[in-house]
Amino acid sequence: MEAGRGAPAAVRAVTVCVARGDPAMELTLVVLIIVVGLVFDFTNGFHDAANAIATSISTRALTPRIALGMAAVTNFAGAFLGTEVAKTVGSGIIGAPEDLSGLLLVMCALLGAIGWNVFTWWRGLPTSSSHALIGGLVGAALAASATVHWSGIVDKVLLPMLLSPLVGVALGYTLHAAVLWTFRHAAPRPLTRRFRLAQTVSAAAMGLGHGLQ
């Protein structure tokens, strides 16, 4: 019975501290959010970052060790080269309260995104960690009765999410057809070396792009 009553008591204690704006609770939540944020970044890495180098390894354009090193460097560099996606996620999706309840909201959103990343990784489902985080933020905001910027979600999340596969299909088809026509009379052996180099460059660009997001 005592253990059964412990959890509700803990929840009530956290709620009271949040309502009072307890500095100790605020510091604790900030530290927890940093830790949970790093865990989310880790799941984001093993969930999405490997996609950029998978084909380079499978075609033997790169060895696994070199490909992993390149992915680490390009993703790390990309994180410092752009902040537009971070700005969108930080302020364009929801209006989080500027108190302890806002910190709780962010932590719950991160935990939800981590759970989805782990589940989809376990099931082998190709999903986006960015969209998982946005979904976590919206869900946590709705539960907390916080502001959700629906126009921003439609313009910056839903429309790009729907258009990106279509644009990818069109560009992929066009580029592949152009490459096949351009090199239709080329000798296979030197062409293979060039394509492996091009694949390495494209994998590095994908890693950089993933880091930017």
UniProtKB/Swiss-Prot annotation:
The keyword Transport applies. One of its GO terms (cellular component) is plasma membrane. The keyword Transmembrane helix applies. It is a multi-pass membrane protein. GO terms for biological process: phosphate ion transmembrane transport. Belongs to the inorganic phosphate transporter (PiT) (TC 2.A.20) family. Pit subfamily. Low-affinity inorganic phosphate transporter. This is Probable low-affinity inorganic phosphate transporter. It comes from Streptomyces halstedii. The gene is pit.
